[in-house]
Design a protein with these regions (language model features):
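General beta-strand structural signal in soluble alpha/beta enzymes
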Residues: 13, 39-42, 95-97, 122-127, ...
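Generic hydrophobic/aromatic pocket-lining and core-packing "Φ" positions
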Residues: 25, 59, 84-88
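A short, basic/flexible loop-to-alpha-helix module at the beginning of a structural domain
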Residues: 1-8, 60, 134-139
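NAD(P)-binding Rossmann-fold cofactor-contacting core
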Residues: 27-50, 126
């Protein structure tokens, strides 16, 4: 039984082209349902791909093109709050932020903005180990 993610969850990886994001995206895809990792986001690498996964310039573009409903974030601390807000503003159902070391003030601003928007996005993290539904999905 899945609660947050399952075999139909479609995932965007923000920071997929970095060392950590690439490693963990490959590991998650190897675990189960590789085709459910549908996009990466990196504004400087938009229009390219990694392991056959298209890279988009924004989360909104990735969501519109792929039907993604979740994002996992492997962006360095200085850019992580902006990455979270981009995913929230794209109205994804779930955002999992793996990044650690995000300044507390940045996260207070993120939570405040989520309240202002009346966001329905569930944010797990930051500094989160991810989540798993056995044999269905690992983020």
């Amino acid at each position: 039984m899945s609660i947050l993610v399952n075999s139909t969850t479609r995932v965007i990886t923000q920071g997929m082209t970095g060392k950590t994001g690439a490693y963990h995206t490959r590991a998650c895809r190897a675990y189960a349902n590789a085709d459910n990792f549908v996009a990466g986001v990196n504004p400087r690498k938009a229009g390219t791909d990694m392991d056959g996964i298209p890279i988009f310039g924004t989360v909104a573009e990735a969501k519109n093109a792929t039907g993604a409903n979740a994002s996992v974030i492997y962006v360095p601390p200085a850019g992580a709050a902006a990455a979270i807000l981009e995913a929230v503003e794209a109205q994804l159902d779930l955002v999992v932020c793996i990044t650690e070391g995000i300044p507390v003030l940045d996260m207070l601003r993120v939570k405040s903005r989520m309240r202002e928007l009346g966001s329905k996005t569930l944010l797990l993290g930051p500094n989160c180990p991810g989540l798993i539904t056995p044999e269905e999905m690992k983020i």
